[in-house]
Amino acid sequence: MKKTHITEQKFADLGLQPQVTEGLEKKGFEYCTPIQALALPVLLTGQDIAGQAQTGTGKTLAFLTATFNHLLTTPEHEGRQPTQPRAIIMAPTRELAIQIFNDAEPLIASTGLKAALAYGGESYDKQLAKLQDGVDILIGTTGRIIDFYKQRVFNLNNIQAVVLDEADRMFDLGFIKDIRFLFRRMPEPKERLNMLFSATLSYRVQELAFEHMHNPEHVVVEPAQKTGHRIQEELFYPSNEDKMALLQTLIEEEWPDRAIVFANTKHKCESVWGHLAADGHRVGLLTGDVPQKKREKILEQFTKGDVDILVATDVAARGLHIPQVTHVFNYDLPDDCEDYVHRIGRTGRAGASGHSISFACEEYAINLPAIEEYIEHTIPVSEYDASALIQDLPAPIRMRAPRVQQRRTNTGGTRSGNRKPQGRRPRQPRQSAPKQS
């Protein structure tokens, strides 16, 4: 969790339980972000909320603080067994569930409440053992939670707090039937504290809130512009044959501390990964079919700085807390306008600055007008000198090789050809977007 000081509202002035305040203070959290300052006073009165806030705004800490505080101030149901959860936090992806659990650890330590994870792609037996040790707060994805429920590992009769994170993404991924299945097996909405968070409060999200929450108050934190003002956006129009060389030239020029390269398909991500790995970059691959253990390892390496570049599909565009991402490269412009916002939102988080570089190539330039209409501004265009691009690129590594390369080495020599691009034209923001034929 990233320390921020965005409002003058202090956690210490909210009337939280001392154990909760202690956990926050030990991690250095003193002031609330806007979503925390708006949501927590409402939640601490026992009022449900449907919150609209994008990733990177501090919403995870908001609902964790409210959940832990609610369980400390609300007597548990009479006759409850230690294996029966009192709170449930549902996330659309296992990576997000893991991140929520990690963010909860300071509060787990300070309050003594027990939390457990339940998500697919990892050993059922290991998670079962954790649940059988006792659980107050269950964090996970709906599929594995339902698996445990149907095996009668626990019931949902004692639920006193519910969080649905990234609700719009739940719809996108087709999990809404699972969500309704779980909601219908919990106590009535008025008997529990309900929290829903979504990047957009669309009609279908509001309908879900109306159906399974008790008179929720809408809390909206929407920036004046959909893309953060701390993010420098830039657009290139590469030909298909220049696209990979341009990416590698820009990486050589920018030399980002931590970058994410987004492509639209698994196959394209593997291709980009192969080229970057062959060129000696410390690069990881994150797509939907990468085994869970390897996904966790790659994310850990990326977060620690052992991997500099992460090549990913949109599976990584939402929900993941990856601090200090300096650059986002949209190798492919996304088909969904909202995905553009979520992708570049990986950088420029919590007050930091960031740089987003997008390619409007021959295949995906058609997506640009809709994206610019959605973000309500044109993206500044830069030109490049094709003759200055890196020419001597090695053949890409195929996927039989490991997905994460070892630390990059410097031989001290120079490579032949135009290895260091010279004479690239200065980047000039456009006056208006050029038309694509």
Curated annotation (Swiss-Prot):
Residues 397-437 are annotated as: Disordered. Pfam families: DEAD, Helicase_C. ATP binds at A53, Q54, T55, G56, T57, G58, K59, T60. Belongs to the DEAD box helicase family. RhlB subfamily. A motif (DEAD box) lies at residues 165-168. Component of the RNA degradosome, which is a multiprotein complex involved in RNA processing and mRNA degradation. Residues 245-390 form the Helicase C-terminal domain. It is found in: Cytoplasm. CDD domains: DEADc, SF2_C_DEAD. Residues 417-428 have a biased composition (Basic residues). The lineage of its organism: Bacteria, Pseudomonadati, Pseudomonadota, Gammaproteobacteria, Vibrionales. One of its GO terms (cellular component) is cytosol. DEAD-box RNA helicase involved in RNA degradation. Has RNA-dependent ATPase activity and unwinds double-stranded RNA. The keyword Repeat does not apply. Its main location: cytoplasm. This is ATP-dependent RNA helicase RhlB. Residues 40-219 form the Helicase ATP-binding domain. GO terms for biological process: RNA catabolic process. Its EC number is 3.6.4.13. Keywords: ATP-binding, Cytoplasm, Helicase, Hydrolase, Nucleotide-binding, RNA-binding. It catalyses: ATP + H2O = ADP + phosphate + H(+). InterPro entries: DEAD/DEAH_box_helicase_dom, DEAD_box_RNA_helicase, Helicase_ATP-bd, Helicase_C-like, P-loop_NTPase, RNA-helicase_DEAD-box_CS, RNA_helicase_ATP-dep_RhlB, RNA_helicase_DEAD_Q_motif. A motif (Q motif) lies at residues 9-37. PANTHER family: ATP-DEPENDENT RNA HELICASE RHLB, ATP-DEPENDENT RNA HELICASE RHLE-RELATED. GO terms for molecular function: ATP binding; ATP hydrolysis activity; RNA binding; RNA helicase activity. It is an enzyme of class 3 (hydrolase).
